[in-house]
Amino acid sequence: MIKTVLFGACGKMGKVIGKALIDATDIELVGAIDPYFKGEKYEKIIGIDKISLEVVESIDELQEDFDVAIDFTNAEAAYQNIKKVLQKGKRMVVGTTGLTQEMMEEFKDLAVKNKTAILIAPNFALGAVLMIQLAKQVVKYFPDVEIIELHHNEKADAPSGTAILTAEVLREEMKKYNLTHKDATKIEKLPGARGGKLDSINIHSVRLPGLVAHQEVIFGGLGQTLSIRHDALSRECYIPGVLMAVREIVKREGFFYGLESFLNREEA
């Protein structure tokens, strides 16, 4: 049985993950952490009576030992949470976005120093991970590519972590084959009309109520276009990826970025 604790347990994503952890037969939720709901009964918050768990403010208040901590909070909170967990020699699965490259280098050092493991994934939807892998294959033949990502209007950061990861993967693949994306635009009549850029790859962000999380990678070629799109229709789509990450991270040591690190289970 893998013992887990959950940071951001009472948030929108946290409640969905909490229910899934409780329902899993090989995983046990032993700690629910959320400073905004300190002292409340977690079973009442998520509407499940299978457990009796009091929400605590921080990991320092936990009485139970654990194997894996899961974080879906914000970048500022996650930074402190991750450091504490890794320093304890415990494993970590992180879905929080907005973490900087400098932070990740620090986490990598902590994981190695404490002989533990951390996975940071911009997206836990298996369909989104496969979308990136498919796009990696396509860009060899269609190097003219742009990314459109669409999210709910409460998302704080833009572009999304998934869009950035997609662009990074495509950039590296294009470098490998010495490919370039041609863009003749010289005048933007409105600043930012062509979106943000990661090297030569344009990323366009849409924020609207009614959306959840969506991304389209559009490739253009002579007389044709090819689009790869993923739509997250509810937060439940992330659950299979989160559970897979929890089950796999206990077998690993080191720093991992992106759920694709765990897709080939035979390598674990």
Swiss-Prot record:
UniProt key word Signal: no
Chain residues that bind NAD(+): 8-13, 34, 95-97, 121-124
GO MF assignments: 4-hydroxy-tetrahydrodipicolinate reductase; NAD binding; NADP binding; oxidoreductase activity, acting on CH or CH2 groups, NAD or NADP as acceptor
BP GO annotations: diaminopimelate biosynthetic process; lysine biosynthetic process via diaminopimelate
Enzyme category, top tier: oxidoreductase
Localization per record: Cytoplasm
Alphabetical keyword list: Amino-acid biosynthesis, Cytoplasm, Diaminopimelate biosynthesis, Lysine biosynthesis, NAD, NADP, Oxidoreductase
Main localization, broad class: cytoplasm
Gene Ontology cellular-component terms listed: cytosol
Catalytic activity: (S)-2,3,4,5-tetrahydrodipicolinate + NAD(+) + H2O = (2S,4S)-4-hydroxy-2,3,4,5-tetrahydrodipicolinate + NADH + H(+); (S)-2,3,4,5-tetrahydrodipicolinate + NADP(+) + H2O = (2S,4S)-4-hydroxy-2,3,4,5-tetrahydrodipicolinate + NADPH + H(+)
Residues the record marks as active site: 151 (proton donor/acceptor), 155 (proton donor)
Record pathway: Amino-acid biosynthesis; L-lysine biosynthesis via DAP pathway; (S)-tetrahydrodipicolinate from L-aspartate: step 4/4
Residues that hold (S)-2,3,4,5-tetrahydrodipicolinate according to the record: 152, 161-162
Pfam families recorded: DapB_C, DapB_N
EC number(s) recorded for this UniProt protein: 1.17.1.8
Entries under PANTHER family matching the protein: 4-HYDROXY-TETRAHYDRODIPICOLINATE REDUCTASE 1, CHLOROPLASTIC-RELATED, DIHYDRODIPICOLINATE REDUCTASE
Homology family: Belongs to the DapB family.
HAMAP family in alphabetical order: DapB (MF_00102)
NCBIfam families (alphabetical): dapB
Function: Catalyzes the conversion of 4-hydroxy-tetrahydrodipicolinate (HTPA) to tetrahydrodipicolinate.
UniProt-recorded name of the protein: 4-hydroxy-tetrahydrodipicolinate reductase
